[in-house]
Every structure is written in C-alpha cells, then in structure tokens.
C-alpha cells in the first residue's frame, strides 16, 4: 500500500475512535457522573 493510503486510514480510524469515545462519554453510563454547571447556578 502507499504511504498516503495508510496515513489516511490511520487518521480516519483515530477520528472515529475519538468521536465514538466522546459520544459514549456524553450519553453512556458515564454521563450520570458528569455535573451540569447550568443546574448548579439557577437563580
């Protein structure tokens, strides 16, 4: 394979991994432990 193809596949995989982890953190079971700064400062 060419170097550009391998680099493109690596960058695509890295981007998909970061996106998947972000969605899991935002909406998965971990999200129950996240704090909401807007609810802490209601007036």
Swiss-Prot record:
The keyword Transmembrane helix applies. The chain crosses the membrane at residues 4-24. Keywords: Chloroplast, Membrane, Plastid, Thylakoid, Transmembrane, Transmembrane helix. GO terms for cellular component: chloroplast thylakoid membrane. It comes from the Eukaryota. InterPro entries: PSII_PsbN. Pfam families: PsbN. GO terms for biological process: photosynthesis. It is a single-pass membrane protein. It is found in: Plastid, Chloroplast thylakoid membrane. Belongs to the PsbN family. HAMAP family: PSII_PsbN. PANTHER family: PROTEIN PSBN. May play a role in photosystem I and II biogenesis. This is Protein PsbN. It comes from Emiliania huxleyi.
């Amino acid at each position: 394979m060419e170097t550009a193809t391998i680099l493109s596949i690596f960058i695509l995989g890295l981007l998909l991994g970061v996106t998947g982890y972000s969605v899991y953190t935002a909406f998965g079971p971990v999200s129950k432990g996240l704090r909401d700064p807007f609810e802490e400062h209601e007036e």
